[in-house]
Structures are given as C-alpha cells and as structure tokens.
Amino acid sequence: RWRLEIRAEDEERYMRGELVEPIQPIIFYIDRNTPEKYIDCIIEAVRDWRPAFEKAGFKNAIDARLAPTVEEDSDFSIYDSTYPFISWKISGQNNAYGPTPCEPRSGEIIACHIGIFCSVLNLEQKWYFAQCGANDPQAWNIELPDSLQYEQIKQVLTHEVGHTLGLEHNFLGSSHYSIDQLRDNDFLSQYSIGSSIMDYVRCNYALRPQDKVDLRNRRVRVGEYDKWAIEWGYRIFPGKDASEREKNRTLWNQEKQKDPSLHFSGRMDVRAQAEDLGNDHVMVNTQGIENLKYLCEHPDVWNVTDKTSLRVLQGRYEAVLEHYKQWVQHVLSHLGGKRLAEPDDENIYIPEKADYNKKVMSFIQAYICLLYTSEAADD
C-alpha cells in the first residue's frame, strides 16, 4: 500500500471519525500526449477512488493532473519512477496495464506506471456491441459517440488504478446480484453491476431490449468490495501499539465479512469466473445469448457502407461468436463444479447443487444441442 499518514495535530480528529487530508496524497501525472478529449475522464477515473479513501478516513487522498512542462517544473521527469504516471501509448495492442512495485520488506508501494494503449477502445467497442447492443442502439454506430468512449476509458483506467493501490483481481465481484437487480436502475445507481471493478466484468448483458437504465449503469464501477478493501488496507485503527491496532482491525473485519458482497476469491470457485455476471449463470447468460440472437436478426446492425465499416463489423461478428462460446462455458462449468464454503463451514468446498445442474442441462439442450440440430436440418 501507499504510505498515507496523518499529521499529529489531526490524529484526534481522525480517531473521532472526521475526514482528514494525508500528509502526502497520491498524485497521478497524465501524459501530455493523451488526446485532450480524454484528459477529464482520466481525472474522473482516478477521483472515483476518493469515496473509498473517505471510508478509510482520508479526504483528497488521491488525484490526477496533467504532467508539468519543463518550464513549470524542471525536476519532473516521466522517467522518474517515483512519480505515479499515466501514459498514453499509440499501439495496436488492445490492452492497458498498472503494475505496482513494492518495497519487499514493508510492502510499501514505491512507484507505479499505468499504460493505456489507444487500441483498447477497439476491444471495448466490440464488448459493448456484443453485451449491450440489444439494449442500446448507440452500440450499432461504426464510431461510438464520445459519451460512450469516455465511460470505456474511465472503466479501463479505474481498474488499473485499483491495481496501483494494491488490489488484486477479485473474480467473485460479479457474482452477487440477481438478474432483477441488474435490471433495476435505482439499485444499479447505488451498487453498480458488481461489487468490484477488480473483477473482469465489462457490461450489463442481463438487460433486455426494453429495459431502461442509465449509461453508467451498463458498466461496472468502484463497488462495495473495493471500498472495503481500501478501508481494510489504509485505515489507521486505534491502539497503543501495532499489535492492538491489528487486533482492532481483525475485529472490525470479522463483522464486515458477514456481508457476502465483500468476499474475495481468485481460487477454484464456479462463481469466480472471468467475464461473467450475476448470481445465476443460467438465467443471466440465457439473456446474453438471446441478446446475441437479437443482434444477428437485425439487418440494420450489419449495414456495410465502406471498408472501415466492413472491418468494424467483421470484428463485431467475431465478438458475437466469442461471447456465445464464453457464456456457454460459464454455464458448463457448473457441471461437476464447486464453490468455496463459508468460513464457518467445516468443508473447504461445496459441490454444485443437483437442482441447479438440471437447469444447466436444460440450457445445454436449448443453446447447444437444439442449436446444432437446427443447423444440421437446414443443411
């Protein structure tokens, strides 16, 4: 974690529960080569972590600003790893990264460098088309509107900032909410589509074409798990020494862990899958596949007008196929699958219930067996 400390004169206020500013906040510097239209949303992505730090008792603990010029600060250098830096890279690679070197003896994060490859937007537009295209006709545009691109950049960067704060992937984050909750705009405004932006969950594919939700509620944001994790890692607990402070942290955490949405899993657990959504894979992924069918049956979606549109639509068609395979695999994983038992359970793992496996078999019949039987009959 970063070294966030409070001033001696603020300690009493902090322990009373008042928000105080850290001695040295975490400041990210933004590459001046970043397209100007994305700078504001990058700053917003970093500041999206502020509520989590407020849970830990800090205000204005994290921020972002444009990197200074030589005239503004002659000591600043993008090659100085002590400055947290967000670089914009011109590359065909569809990715971003956010490694965090630590001092091995203390665990203190001593540097970070986030990289965003410009082509990550190509991947994001494919995901949004396949996952939200049935609900949002904006996804049909060959070039997505700026409002969508801003949300995509924000989601990518917020995830990478989470890594630089010390958070690992939590693939259990997308497994807590029901399909009804994922279609409820008020619920989504409060909780997002998952409890953690550190999961590989992209968009809200539980939505039907007729569902009405805000743009921000079609994507994942900093969630309840993320806020808890930052509080667990950064809050200074009361105590006369380190041992007592750790004891108080443990007692606090034992109470918090009664909330399943704060649980973590990167281990073998059928609920902890990448690119999934919801607490019922059969139900949510059924809707996802129905949405793919909806897109495939609309000729306006596939209107080729020039070479650019041809390349974009080819990529989107491939994304449709990939999502079909992916969502089928999520469901198949429940056959013989197991989930991590609760801490008070004498078992380590619990096998998937037989009743749920019957639902899995019905899904297989509908979306694998009958699908291929129909194709064979057409041939």
Give the role of each language-model region.
Residues 2-26, 86, 90-95, 99-143:
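Active-site-adjacent "gating/activation" loops or surface patches in catalytic cores
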Residues 2-5, 41-48, 52-56, 152-156, ...:
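Generic, well-ordered alpha-helical scaffold segments in large soluble proteins
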Residues 1-76:
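Fold-level signature of zinc-dependent metallopeptidase catalytic domains
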Residues 174-374, 379:
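Conserved catalytic/binding loops enriched for acidic/polar residues
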Residues 8, 34, 92-94, 118-122, ...:
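Short loop/turn segments at secondary-structure transitions that flank enzyme active sites
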Residues 39-42, 52, 98-100, 113-114, ...:
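Short, solvent-exposed loop/turn and secondary-structure capping segments
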Residues 66-89, 151-208:
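The catalytic-center signature of Zn2+-dependent metalloproteases
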Residues 140-156:
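Short pre-active-site segment immediately N-terminal to the catalytic Zn-binding motif
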